[in-house]
Amino acid sequence: MANRLQRGDRSRLLLLLCIFLGTLRGFRARQIRYSVPEETEKGSFVGNISKDLGLEPRELAKRGVRIVSRGKTQLFAVNPRSGSLITAGRIDREELCETVSSCFLNMELLVEDTLKIYGVEVEIIDINDNAPSFQEDEVEIKVSEHAIPGARFALPNARDPDVGVNSLQSYQLSPNNYFSLQLRGRTDGAKNPELVLEGSLDREKEAAHLLLLTALDGGDPIRKGAVPIRVVVLDVNDHIPMFTQSVYRVSVPENISSGTRVLMVNATDPDEGINGEVMYSFRNMESKASEIFQLDSQTGEVQVRGSLDFEKYRFYEMEIQGQDGGGLFTTTTMLITVVDVNDNAPEITITSSINSILENSPPGTVIALLNVQDQDSGENGQVSCFIPNHLPFKLEKTYGNYYKLITSRVLDRELVQSYNITLTATDQGSPPLSAETHIWLNVADDNDNPPVFPHSSYSAYIPENNPRGASIFSVTALDPDSKQNALVTYSLTDDTVQGVPLSSYVSINSNTGVLYALQSFDYEQFRDLQLRVIARDSGDPPLSSNVSLSLFVLDQNDNAPEILYPALPTDGSTGVELAPRSAEPGYLVTKVVAVDKDSGQNAWLSYRLLKASEPGLFAVGEHTGEVRTARALLDRDALKQSLVVAVQDHGQPPLSATVTLTVAVADSIPEVLADLGSLESLANSEASDLSLYLVVAVAAVSCIFLVFVIVLLALRLWRWHKSRLLQASEGGLAGMPTSHFVGVDGVQAFLQTYSHEVSLIADSQKSHLIFPQPNYGDTLISQESCEKSEPLLIAEDSAIILGKCDPTSNQQAPPNTDWRFSQAQRPGTSGSQNGDDTGTWPNNQFDTEMLQAMILASASEAADGSSTLGGGAGTMGLSARYGPQFTLQHVPDYRQNVYIPGSNATLTNAAGKRDGKAPAGGNGNKKKSGKKEKK
């Protein structure tokens, strides 16, 4: 009676469970992957279960989401409020997976109302929480003093339970004169440190050596452990023990009992006494193996003292050391293979089931979900599950070791009202082990995700001048769907770059997502591309997503510096710069100006003097390019100085350019013109005739000018003498004031400004001489005849002519303002000075400026065919940007002894006589400073 009541209660419970689960219609299995670092605090976030299941957090408890697998699942839990998978306890990767490099914990997540099972795989990421350590506090090694160099001595292995890069990586030995450290690899990838003797030992000199062995891992930060090593030098022991086998191999079943002998090793030593007694010990034995095996140090017998488990450790490799009393040792390897034994029967776990089914349910209706497991491996762990063939049901394998029990045909309640289904699981061991369970079933009267990119945007970098077809970047989109719905193809949006279709620059592999360059990019053309990658799955209808990708072109040093000044002539000639012989050290001769089309460090330029005809005479500013005198010019210095200046950028590798400068050393134009013939003859013998013509022409002009001056002087003396006679004859007449203006009777012709423009081009076949052209804008103001002397007359003549003039008249008169020039006419940065400012002509710089202007003008004319200087006065034909940045230095005045007939003015440069104004006609024929016309 009691049994009937129990059966009735059981039936009612099964009926209620069938009604509760009667609405279950589908099943779907998939795997969810998460990762979490070890030693994470309890309650830490692992993954968003609700999001991955497509549920709201509040629906998890309502729909019966729970973890159903066994094992290490107590380490994780589902938070019903947040819908997250969290840690439920301390996670120690070394405890869970020990030496396994990849540590995964698998569990199953069941959605109760839909009978869906999800595989959850959590990867435990190792952190560097363990430092390498040695089991011994101190290691003592005994070495014979007659040990030959190259002898090896075993060192202890450090232990680091971490894996991967955080595990033990290397060893270091403290510096010493006798020993070195070498690592010997093992079959499992580990390395054993060995102490190698590098030199002969002498016990009488040093009986012991203290060393320090340090083990380091590869974590960040690096952890290390050290053990002191004391090397004791012993007396002679000339034989080492020898094992009978170099490798001992043995296989033992996993169910071997404790205390059973595994094998016995044997080593012999021909020495006598203590040197022939061999002691056995494990060398560099792992802590886990030391708990299972033990070695008799006297006999060499290896025994099992712990329990073997094939499922944990399948193979052991140990080194056994045989050492005699003299400290010599030898090693052998013992390989123990654990053989699996079918000692575990399969286990059947019903994760979910129904106890009632509609009779008209279509074939394939899910009745129950079950899991079968076997702790054995190999054939012993291969499990097959089956049910009796006469039942209208069948088992289908779903995921891993999970099965679902479904109907194979339509059930008829009128024929059978209930079924007792027996499930049997059998492994493939010998003998096979099996397990079974029962399911009672009563027959009652009666389905997304676009591809997702891991990042919201990407940035890729490619150096310019890349080869066509080079791989630039790779994008990957993940689709949580499966099969066709997870097949992702990639494409680019149809955009344009500078009016050119994007497809002409880059392309993408539709299957792999690899981006390729179709052209060689130029950083100077454009520096970045903005792309948008589209990922589309193969579902129906297809779903897609896109992501932005910024492609940045990196600059390379592909442009050499370009020299702007001095410009390279088209006829192969070189421009000439002027440096007066009176120039002091640091005098600015010229400036080399260069630019680089690259950017950043590739465009940083430095200047250096590569070659000079007179070493040590000139120096070049490293960062400015200014060419200055390094010392005072000497008479022995050649008139023509050749300089080779190199301009180099800071790219990798650096690129450079060179320019050759020719500097003429002279104090004045006549000196240059006098030596011009010799300069040209030295430069090129073929131009000697042309140089001769130039010298003859200049000499002729000088002679004509000298004759003209003599005539004017004679005329002036004659007029003066005539005026004295008139004064003597007309003594009773009222005196007329002396005119303060120079007459127009021929003296004005002398006051015309003559410009001798000479183009000197070194190493050229051409030279130019432009004859003087008058400038009628200059006027000299006459002074009283007794205010100053005429230096060109001898003292006696002066006394006769001047008569009773004041003896102070020999003082130097103030300069004529007509010899002043505007600031804009001075060499320097073009356009940087106010054109209205005036200043006295620099001492002894008139010839220098004229020669430089003429040199630059001729260089420009050689390049563009022009007969003018091209630039404004004082600019030397340079633009405001690239003009040489220098100021002419003052040198001793030589014009204070020059007298101009018919005028009381001298070519002196007395201070304090400036009127701050430019002469009335001083700039009549001059142009403003400006950039040279480009052709």
UniProtKB/Swiss-Prot annotation:
Membrane topology: Single-pass type I membrane protein
Topological domain spans for side Cytoplasmic: 715-935
Extracellular side, ranges: 30-693
Ranges for region Disordered: 805-844, 905-935
UniProt GO MF annotations: calcium ion binding
TM annotation in the entry: 694-714
One protein family per Pfam: Cadherin_C_2
PROSITE patterns per the UniProt record, alphabetical: CADHERIN_1, CADHERIN_2
PANTHER family given in the database record: CADHERIN-87A, PROTOCADHERIN GAMMA-A11
Function: Potential calcium-dependent cell-adhesion protein. May be involved in the establishment and maintenance of specific neuronal connections in the brain.
Protein's name according to its UniProt entry: Protocadherin gamma-A11
Biological source species: Pan troglodytes
